[in-house]
Amino acid sequence: MYDLIVLGGGPAGYNAAERAAHKGLKTLVLEGRALGGVCLNEGCVPTKTLLYSAKIFDYTKHGDAYGVKCEGSSLDHAFVVGRKNKVVKQLTGGIAMQLKSAGADVISEFGIIKGRDAEGFTVEAAGKEYKGARLLICTGSDALVPPIEGLRESVAGGFAMTNREILDMETVPERLTVIGGGVIGLEMASYFCSAGSQVTVVEMLDHIAGPTDGEISKILLKNYQKKGVNFILGAKVTKVGEGKVVYEKDGKAESVEADKVLVSIGRRAHTQGIGLENVGVLTERGAIVTDEYCRTSVPGIWAAGDVNGKSMLAHTAYREGEVAVANMLGGKERVNYLSIPSVIYTNPEVASVGETSESVKAKGIEAKTASVTLKYSGRYVAENEGGDGIVKLIVDKEHNRLIGVHMIGNYASEIIYGAAMMVEKEMRVDDVKKFVFPHPTVCEVIREAMFMI
């Protein structure tokens, strides 16, 4: 009999299991694939490994502006993929060691919830049953493959791919068409453009990067176009196959030729086939319904990570797993989704937290904004010839509180956590003005912007 059974060994699952085991709960993790989930095996870490190689290669192409001569540099894609695999293997091994050290049991099988009785929940894995007083569902998400004519056949035949397959592609395609201009699509477009592909992104919306603040999105688009990525916006893909992607734009059918196609229009919670119906867990649009305490509709069952369909970010999953464990032990911790930062690891990087200009307008929030060039930072100027990065602040007029911060430029991913804390703690502009930021850094532009709002 276990105190806690965790279904899924991704960021939410393995982190929660480690925390629970350290707190004295007899814990079992059931994971049918590799520990680390999508993030470590086919998402966050693999893509960042590829993108770092691309960033170094891009620097060699523009080294002349900094007095560095790098004639004849090239990117060895096969080597990059091999290094990616080594990084993933090292980190998955680390997770296994962490769980073992914490005292959590791990079984490399998928778990299916069979039912509940007076003792707790029954979960089956590979024909064997396990009992748990509590359940934490962290089964993650799957890449969405929409019902576009020819798409499923193209995926089966290898012409089209999801994020899982493209990360292991052995060669760089001459022409890559990306369906979807969200985070995954943009990051892969960035890498393969650097690697030598002729990249075209087809996006149904009239902008890229989804809910990213519009001003930031436009700057990112400009940088991508300058790099050589072609964008077809406001277009709906209608057919995939025979070496091309057919789309409809402004009422006209057009097409773009491709050697490979990446499908990246989003993800859906993995809730099918795990036995939710056997215990009555409520779902909505395929995702498990949870509250801010990570509770499901069934007492004794919590859910964390992509499976709840909320944020679908690994760092959100970490926190949700921790909140679930704390609350199953009597705590009252909650997840504040508005203060969770997001990052697009392109070159330049994009990082955001809180409200955008579009969201405050939609919610009717009286807000004021300030957009400040990163050229106020001496370090940014020293490291960026012709850089167009900015930081944008959004402040509610009534209380003069910081409710949104958005950046595009070097180090944005490493700076945004500080802005997230400001938003989380509902800091006022005058409070932040009193902070002393190190100089010369890029982050000090946030403080400078406070004096301009």
Annotate each PLM feature.
Residues L7-G10, N15-R33, V38, V45, ...:
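Flexible, glycine-rich terminal cap/loop adjacent to redox cofactors
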Residues Y2, E18-L25, L30-V172, T200, ...:
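Glycine-rich flavin
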Residues M1-Y2, A125-R134, G251-K260, S297:
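Core beta-strand elements of the Rossmann-like FAD/NAD(P) dinucleotide-binding domain
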Residues A17, A21, A189, C193-S194:
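Gly/Ala-rich phosphate-binding loop of Rossmann-like dinucleotide-binding domains
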Residues E153-V172, S255-N327:
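FAD-site-proximal beta/loop scaffold in flavoenzymes
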Residues A125-K128, K236-V237, G243, Y247-S255, ...:
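A structured beta-alpha segment of the ubiquitous adenosine-cofactor-binding alpha/beta core
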